[in-house]
């Protein structure tokens, strides 16, 4: 009897959906968010000093099965950066208002860093809107705070961030980061350094650094 050849599985290519950037004006402030996919809703909330692009690859993958919304928090990314309330409660209210735009009734909330704190506050304030809560290195769960963030939150932190607008300061920090990263890469600070430098690259704009400092103090 001739042995039957194993059949090859019918593999289909994985389809990625590219998020589209949209804007909505809510309570007088322009909010930016990226949305992709269809199906049950997922809300991705980024960390302090970051923006929605940090979720790009995750959002495209999840969008194959879900409606995935990744906002730029107020004071971050392409959203407005006013002199406003940057507390987690205010951010949670902003997330509720943003979800009302596409008329989403319930959502799985995923938060990283500050976004984790916002996600927890959102679940506390609006439990009727939350299906699941997922935290990734969430702020407010432990007392650990990045050393650089501690410095930036001090009274002179805003002045220190303003130095990023001077010529050659940011390039010098980037060179220092590469050298220091090689030397202390196995330590907690070494692991955080590349992420911190990536965030600092977005802060030379005066409104961005001011919003960053206000968020830290909130």
Describe each model-derived feature in a short phrase.
Residues 120, 124-125, 131-167:
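Flexible "cap/lid" loop of the alpha/beta hydrolase fold
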Residues 135, 146-149, 165-218:
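Conserved alpha/beta-hydrolase catalytic His-Asp/Glu region
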């Amino acid at each position: 009897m001739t042995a039957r050849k194993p059949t090859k599985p019918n593999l289909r290519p994985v389809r990625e959906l590219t998020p589209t950037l949209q804007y909505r004006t809510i309570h007088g402030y322009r909010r930016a968010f990226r949305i992709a996919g269809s199906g049950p809703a997922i809300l991705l909330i980024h960390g302090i000093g970051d923006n929605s692009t940090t979720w790009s690859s995750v959002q495209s993958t999840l969008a194959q099965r879900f409606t995935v919304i990744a906002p730029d928090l107020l004071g971050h990314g392409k959203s407005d950066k006013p002199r406003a309330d940057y507390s987690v409660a205010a951010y949670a209210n902003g997330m509720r208002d943003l979800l009302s735009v596409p008329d989403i009734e319930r959502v799985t909330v995923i938060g990283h860093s500050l976004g984790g704190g916002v996600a927890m506050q959102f679940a506390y304030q609006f439990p009727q809107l939350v299906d699941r809560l997922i935290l990734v290195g969430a702020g407010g769960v432990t007392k650990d705070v990045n050393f650089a963030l501690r410095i930036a939150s001090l009274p002179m932190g805003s002045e220190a961030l303003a130095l990023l607008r001077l010529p050659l300061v940011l390039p010098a920090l980037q060179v220092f980061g590469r050298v220091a990263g090689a030397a202390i890469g196995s330590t907690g600070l070494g692991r955080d350094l590349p992420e911190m430098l990536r965030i600092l690259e977005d802060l030379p704009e005066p409104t961005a650094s001011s919003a960053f400092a206000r968020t830290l103090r909130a």
